[in-house]
Amino acid sequence: ALSGAPFDVKFISFDDIKVDPKVLDSIDVLINVGDGDTAHTGGKVWEDPEISSAVKGFVHRGGGLIGVGEPGGHQYQGRYLQLAAPLGVEKETGFALNYDKYNWDEHRDHFILADCPDHDVDFGEGKKNIFALEGTEILIQRDKEVQLAAHEYGQGRGVYISGLPYSFVNNRVL
């Protein structure tokens, strides 16, 4: 989706972050895209506290994080989405069924949706069973499943997108 867009794109591996966490200081936004427990989103690498704290610290200090699908998806220490704190969302895997989930108000007037017709987005297949954590702005939800959310984390911001097939509108969302 970024091909041809006016952005400098740099691919950073988890190994790059492990060797030198300051590699994140040279970028503005991190994007983590894919299904959980895959090489794309990291899988077991999120069990490494150096990786986890470097990424979360980057966002907390003012960086941006865009997560698509199941970003940081790996069941560990009571969480499935290891980037839940900065993104403000979590996947219901059966461990939080007894938690009250009252945060379902949509904020379709959010600036992220300003260029979208009818303030809507095509999420393709998207992901199921994603819920918002306290303090997260749900921009779009469908049947009590978060499709698009924004969450301030320290001085930075996380944005969760359930799916992002290529289109002009989705390019604008990014």
Give the location of each predicted region.
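A structural signal for short, well-ordered beta-strand segments and their strand-loop junctions
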Residues: 11-13, 66-69, 160-161
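Alpha-helical scaffolding within the catalytic cores
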Residues: 14-21, 50-53, 143-147
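Extracellular/periplasmic catalytic domains that process cell-envelope and extracellular macromolecules
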Residues: 23-25, 59-60, 152-153
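Aromatic-Pro/Gly-enriched surface loop or interdomain linker
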Residues: 1-29
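A glycine-rich, often tryptophan-bearing local segment used as a flexible ligand/cofactor-contacting loop or short
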Residues: 37-119, 170
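Catalytic beta-strand/loop cores that center a nucleophilic Ser/Cys/Thr
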Residues: 92-172
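Structural motif
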Residues: 28-35, 66, 158-160
